Amino acid sequence: MDYGGVLTDGAAMLALPGRARAAGLPTALVSDGNEVPDAVCRLFDVVVLGAQIGARKPDPDVFRRVAAMLDVPPQECVMVDDLARNVRGARAAGMVAVQHHDVDVTVCEVGILLDLPPV
């Protein structure tokens, strides 16, 4: 999941990682930015900021490496980002990717994809 443009879009978006974790799913925050509030970072199992792993989004290798950090095959990952180029990069890595435009739509789509209980 991305920070800027996604998690900054309100409480319902910020609740998604917690809902996923409550369902037993590992979570990751991947941001090209270098700073994310600690309170947001604590919502995730893995946090990758900037070029910490030697590449940046939309490079598919970023998404593959993060999936490996989660010990989850890329094809079992759902990535959410507001930028089409990053969605394409995640898809090229084999992930299901959701382009965020609208909070209600994204929360619904991710909930369905991850089989999360309704809120």
Where in the sequence are the language-model features?
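Asp-based, Mg2+/Mn2+-dependent phosphohydrolase catalytic module
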Residues: 1, 14, 25, 30, ...
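Asp-based phosphoryl-transfer active-site loop
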Residues: 1-10
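Short amphipathic alpha-helical segments and helix-helix/interface helices
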Residues: 13-21
